[in-house]
Every structure is written in C-alpha cells, then in structure tokens.
Amino acid sequence: MARSLVIVESPAKAKTINKYLGRDYTVKASIGHVMDLPKKTIGIRLPDDEPKKRKGKGKKRGKAGEEKAPRKPVTLDDAKIFEPVLHIISGKGKVINDLRKSANSAEAVYLAGDPDREGEAISAHLALVLSKPTKYVEAEAPNGQKGKAEEEKESSKAKPGKKIKDEISIPPIDPKKIFRVTFNEITPKAIRAAFEKPRQIDTNLVDAQQARRVLDRIVGYKISPLLWDKVRRGLSAGRVQTVALRLIAEREQEIRAFVHQEYWTIHAMLDAGEPPLFEARLFKHQGEDIQVPNQETADKILAAVRQAKWQVASVAQKEKKRNPPPPFTTSKLQQAAYNRLRYTAKRTMALAQRLYEGVELGEEGSVALITYMRTDSVHVSNDALAQVRELIPERFGSSYLPAKPNYYKSKKDAQEAHEAVRPTDVLRTPEDVRKYLDDNLFKLYQLIWQRFVASQMLPAIFDQTTIDISAGEYTFRATGSVQKFDGYMRVYQLPAAAADREEDEKEDEGEGKALPRVTEGQTLRLDQIRPEQHFTEPPPRYTEATLVKELEEDGIGRPSTYASIISTIVEREYVKKDQGRFTPTMLGERVSGLLVKSFDDVFDLKFTARLEEELDEIEEGKLPWRQAVREFWEKFVVDLAKADDEMVSYKAGIPTGKKCEKCGQGELLERISRHGFFLGCSRYPDCDFIQDLSPDLGEDSGNGETKVEYCDNCGKEMAIKRGRFGTFLACTGYPDCKTTRRLVQGTRIAHQPDEPLDEKCTLCGNGLVKKHGRFGEFIGCSGYPKCKYTRPITMGIKCPKCNEGEFVRRGSAGKGGRGRPRIFYGCSRYPDCDFTTPHMPIAESCPKCGAPFIVEKRTKTGNVRACFKEGCDWEQSIPEAQPQAHAEEAPVPVAAKS
C-alpha cells in the first residue's frame, strides 16, 4: 500500500503527477470543489436575517418545560456575521469516501491544489471533509464557518437500513497528517521541491477567496431578484459582471452621441532625382502645427504650394530599437490569443488548462507543457532563463542572445511567487509536439513558446529617417524606417492587421518604407499633390482583447475571472458580438441603466477596483475579511433599500411622455414581454396599440451609416418579421426565397461572411468556403446557388462504430427546447454509417477505462462529463463555473411571487 496520498483537482493533472512521484505515492483527484454554498439559498449569515420559524407544533421548551426565548436577530456585532454556510456538493459522497479510504491507509496526505486562492480553498475544504469525525460532515469549516451537508437532509427521510447515495461511510483521518504542497509547473524538479517543503493551509488565502465569494453572493442574490421583479425572471447582476456590462453599454452611448468632425490631409509625391518617388504629408504652417478643417482651406493650401519651391529643410537619421515583449501573464495571453488566433478568453483558458495539466506525448506519456496559466507575474525562474539562453544561440545564432537575461517588472500587486506563463521545457519546441496536439492546442502552445523565447532575445533595430521639406510657408514631412536587425521579431512576428496589435506592437509611421538619399538644401520636384477628406471616428466597440485590457487596466476583477465574466454577459443576452466586437442588446442597455442608476457607487469602476485591492490585503494578512465585507455591506444595504422603492419597472410600464398614436388619450409606456421591449398604451385593454421596439433595418449604426441587411441567397433586402418564437429577419423575396436569420432580444445576429478555403469544389471546380448556417458552421461551394455542394466540418474524433469517419455536428427539423432546432452528433460517412448521439463528444480519453473520447450530457441533476463506452461508469459533474474562478453569484429562479 502506498505510504502517501496526493490529492489534486483533476484526473488529467493526477495522471501527469503520478508518473513523477513513483510507487511511494498514490495520486487521486477531487474533481474540483467538494464544498460550496447552497444553490437555492444565499447561504450567508446576514445582518437582516429574521429568526427562523421553529418547526413542529407548539412552543419549543427547555429541559424543565420552560418556554425558550426566540433567537435574537443577527446584527453587525454578531461574532459570526457574514459567515458562509458550506454544503458538500451533491454527488461528492462517493469521491469523499474514496479519498478517505485511501487517506486512512496512508501515513501522510498532501493537498496539491493549484497555487492560488481557489486552490487553497479547495485544499482547505478537502482537509475538512477528510478529518471531521461526523458521518454527514455537519462540520466546522476553516476560520469558523459551519458546513452542513445536503446529504444530512436525505438521511432524515431515508428508511432504516437503506443505503444513502452520498453517505460518508468511511471514518475520518487524523488532521495532523494533512499537508499542503504547491508548485507552479508540473515537472519533476518543481514537484520534488514542493514535497521537500510541505506547509499548512494558508488561512489568509482562504479568507481572501471566501471574502470574494461572500461579496459576489450578496450582490447576486440581493440584486438579481430586483431585476426579476422590474424586468423579467432569470436575469442576473454581478459585482464585476455588471461593471463589464456598464463599460460596453457606456461605450455604445459614446458612439451614438459622437459628432463626426471633418478634416483634411494633404499628401505630396516628390522626386529627389533618383528612385524611389516618396510621399510627404503636410505637417506645419509657419512653424506651427496645422489643422485643415474643410475643402475650402485645403484648396487654398494647394494653390499656394503648387507655386512654391520644394526644398529639403532638414534630414534626421537615427537608430531605433523595438524591445521584445515580456512573457505572458494571464490577461496578455488572453489578449494575444484573441488578436492572433481569434480564441475567446474562455477557449484560451480551457486550452491552457489542458496544456498545464498534461497531454499525451506518445511514449513519454502525459506531459505538462506550460506553467500555471493563472498569473499576473512576469517573473521567470533562473533554471528557465538558463535553458532558453542555451536554446537561442543554438537555434538562431549568438547574435540574437543578449549579454545578460532580460528582466521584466511585474505590476505592483503581482504575486512574484508565481511565474509567467511559459513552456515547462523550452527545448520541447512546437515542431516536436505538433503530431501529438490538435490544431487548437498546438497554436496556443506555439504562441506561448514563441513569446517566451522572444522575451529573452535582443531588440529589433530599425534605421529611421525623417525628412522635413519646405514649400513656401508650409512644411511637409516624410518618414521612412527600414529594418536593420530583426532581433526578437525573428520568432515573434507582428500581426498583419494593425487593429490586432497590442499597444507596444504598433508600427511607427513609415515603417517598412525606404526613402531616397537627400541632403539639406536639395531642391525637389513636385510630381503630384492630392488632398484627402476624413471624418473623426467614434471610439471603437470593445473586442474580447480590448475589454480584457480595459478591465485589467482599471483593476476590475482578476484575469482568472475574465473568461467567466464575458461568457456570462453573452449567455444572459446582455451583449452580442458583431464582427468580433461587443454591442449591448436592448435588454443589456436597460439592465445596465437600471443598475447604474440605483447602485452607482457599487458598480463604480474605482469602487470595484478598490475592493480588489482589499482582497489582496486580506490575502497578505493586512485586513480582516469580515471588516472588508462589513464596509461593503453598510454602503450596499442603503442602495438596496432605496432601489427596492424607487427602481422603475418595465413590467408595470415606464412612462415615455408620448401620446398614444391610436387613441390619442393614453400615454405610451415602455414594457417588456417574452419577445422583447415594446410600447403599449396606458389605456390597455381599452386600447390595444403596440409598437415593437426591436431595431429596424433603418437603424443608425452609430457611425452615420444606415444598416441594411441583404439576403445571402438572392441579394434582396431583409425585413423584420414576428413569429411564434419572437422576431426574426426574413427575405423580402418570399415565397421565392425563404431565407431567415435569427434575432436575439430584438437585435440582429451579426452576419458572418463566408471564409474562403484553399480547396476546390469536387462538383464544379469553384473555391470552397466556410459558411454559417442555423445548425452551425459547414463547408459549401462559393458557386451557390448554382452549385449546392456542402459537407459538414468534422470534430477530429473518430466514429466509434465504423472507425473511419469523424463526428460532425448536425441539426434536425425537430424542435429542441424553446423552439430551437434539435442538435445531435453523427458520423461524417452518413449514410454509409448511421451512428448518432445526442451528447457532445469531447476529445479527451476516459481517465478510468482509457476510451478515446468522453461526452458531455445533461442529466436531471445537471450537466456531466461521462464515458461513452458501455459498461464504464466514469462520470464527472460539471460545476457552474470553472474550479479556479466561480461565476458571479445569482439565485436560482423559483416560483414567482404572488
């Protein structure tokens, strides 16, 4: 029997660690959290809680028969104020029994959860459930919390002798043999170092996680019911989620309010007597900066300079360096993965998690390819620096290696104990692992590898030339820049599109443009001069990358939570994506407006950022967690009471001050139905006037242009129609053309253009394109509708029936929930192979039986991952949020209030 037990969060991580520890250790997984707040109640001891009504008939009496006094209301002076009530997560009894069984036979138990607040909290809860000597773990949690298992409720209803599914039947262990170990990378050296210095649970880290959880729970569970009452059920608010929505909504308001200003630029093509001709731009007038506001001014300047003598006024040459970027932090990884690979933050973090926990590399087995991916530090270990400095001269030449390592400064509140996101072994190049990784994993690993190697290379060097040319009273300027040494750019190229570049990747004016040799005083010939009209542009809408950047710069939330925050506001239909940029839906704007008006201080950017700083202070042991929550509560409860009385209701109708167009007597009220927002008469039902507020085709896009949607198939305009499931876009060519497009909350789903592929159609020879249909993406002929060739896009997972085809996502005309098409997964060789499954396949092997893939499916108790193989009972519940970052709290909708 193994002498020591090691517990981690996931089977993949357990598999990777197990091969490094040897036979003296058994490594098992807790499958994420084992304890959490209850799903259907707030689960926190709050100051306004009323005494619970006692069950049973008559008064509760003491031993001598005297009547017991009712429990006193909870006040802010209560010693256990804001205490969370933790439950064992439903279905975890089997996991806990298994861990207890192994722990009882081990001489030591090591909790090896991730090295952050969430990992520390998981470890603290594991220590509790392993060591508390009660059958159903009605237990004292870390720092005085009380944890009460949902299983206890089941036990009270169970018949005598009947086995309870989640009963904790294995005895607890001695808490003295429980230790905590942490490591930033899953490598033999890092693991050995961690086990040489085990420690106890860090209560400061646990307190910081607990404080964040309590704050998020208070906001979600207290404000969300307000939205149910005032707007509609199922909506949610979140401490950080709502601030992110506010940023997007306020940016949209800026765009609408933006007034375009005309301005002109003037460009001259000049001949210096030797090639090439070069361009100069109007720069100054009589030595002062100049603005050209209109065509009249531009024409006057043109008339003056056409008659002027063009002469070189000055020539300046200098060498300019572009320094390499630092290795990735979490947020920078999310930004770069979106800009370069178009990966969402959620997708990036899911892929990075797999690279961190371990992937199969043939005979090597499971290998962790990157360090821990949730970090705000750019620190790199000395061993990693030595290794990359060995690689650079061997692979690229000694001219690319700086004399000493490049060191980068992390932001002030970064955890220097963590490292940047980097390869665990930089000598394991992307080419070495290419055959073992799918495209998505490979591209992300390649990006991380390239960024890390580039960070330790020499700067790129450019020869920059600036020529000022006089033309009478006016000065024109030409700038050219030619790369002299590529440096780190040998490895880490700039994205082709300027819009996809980070702030420190912006090209200088004239980069890549050569200028002829000229001397001061040299006369030039004017070859051509042209004016160009421009208009100022409104601030751009946020992309995932720029939203993450804004949140980080404002100190809102933490990079580890950005993926879940962005996913939530999209899933709640508060925002939609239009060509990769976030636009608030009508619902999102209304919700943001209500919350910001009633809770302006709670959802203020600076206030939210200050709360994040306080969480850091709790982690450092500088601030008691209850004090931070109490200060928030005292401000919040005042706003909550005021909002309960004063927040306007879209259910009741919000007066617009406009008379009804039909009866002329009633006032138009803005209201909401299941189809979206509309205007209705206050005299309803006597007057049934209704006006849909869904944006129409003539809606202003915010940049002065009118949006008109055209049919993909016939080219005719699309019109908004209403059907049994709400509004949608339909072709005006109906019935000859029956094309439709879905709308969300009255706003159109962005049209996604066809993406050309480097492939020819087997029927007609035209190019193939990736198309977007009602059932998802597919490949079709660019010659449509003349050629109707199509084929599905495969998922890279072999069909288990024929072992030749691959899974594809399909849809049928039959309806799923809420009128949606029914989605299923089948073999790409259909009709030769008719295998189908309603469950989504996932390219991960079963940790129990080794089956080549698992599936995600919905059960009565929630979504689970399970083995597809008949006879294998492996199953893993999918928590509502990633184990490392809980989604912000919102109550589960229950029966409507009477």
Question: What feature does the model see in each segment?
Answer:
Residues 16-20, 98, 102, 121-129, ...:
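Alpha-helical scaffold elements adjacent to nucleotide-binding pockets in ATP/GTP-utilizing enzyme cores
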Residues 291-326:
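Metal- or metallocofactor-binding catalytic centers and their adjacent structured scaffolds
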